[in-house]
Amino acid sequence: MKIQKHKEIYWGELRGASISKTRKDFTYLYGSTIIFHSPDQVYFENKLIASGQTIHEWSSSWNYQGDRQVPSLPLLKRGRSYSLTRDMTSYPSESVFLKLIFFDRYNREVSNHVERSDKMTFTYPEEAYSYKVQLLSAGVESFEFHCLRIEEILEESNG
């Protein structure tokens, strides 16, 4: 198995859910302390955030004319296998889940995957047109976020 590197995905801009009517690429701001040390080092703290709440979201699909933003996730190829890894430290440990949601061309959810560990592997569905990655609270109080990595898994042929 070989892994083809992709660009690292950083936190990006702060966009509260109240700003974004479609709730694309937003950050949970209510009662949160967020400190940007650098693009690859963001501190988040909110001791009262409910479990299951989306903390931050990245999307591969945008309406540039409406949002004036470019997609924060790379385009993926249908039917290919990928690895999604997060580089972060949370307190308490393992208190942030990764959620991956796939959508068809009419923005209907095709499937989703939720993972507690720092790494998940998935195959991009044939019917998928776009996708989102979310950080979900699972009793988190604070964390230090560095980046996400999406890498294609290339199968080696023996020949």
Swiss-Prot record:
InterPro entries, A to Z: Acessory_Sec_prot_Asp3 (IPR022259)
Keyword entries, A-Z: Protein transport, Translocation, Transport
Domain of life: Bacteria
Keyword Transport: yes
UniProt keyword annotation of Transport present: yes
Pfam family, one: Sec-ASP3
Gene Ontology biological process terms from the UniProt entry: protein transport
Changes seen on gene knockout: Loss of export of cell wall protein GspB, the protein accumulates intracellularly in protoplasts.
Sequence similarity: Belongs to the accessory Sec system protein Asp3 family.
Protein purpose: Part of the accessory SecA2/SecY2 system specifically required to export GspB, a serine-rich repeat cell wall protein encoded upstream in the same operon.
Record text on subunit structure and interactions: Part of the accessory SecA2/SecY2 protein translocation apparatus required to export cell wall protein GspB. Binds the Ser-rich domains (SSR1 and SSR2) of non-glycosylated GspB, binds much less to glycosylated protein.
Record protein name field: Accessory Sec system protein Asp3
Annotated source species: Streptococcus gordonii
Lineage of the organism: Bacteria, Bacillati, Bacillota, Bacilli, Lactobacillales
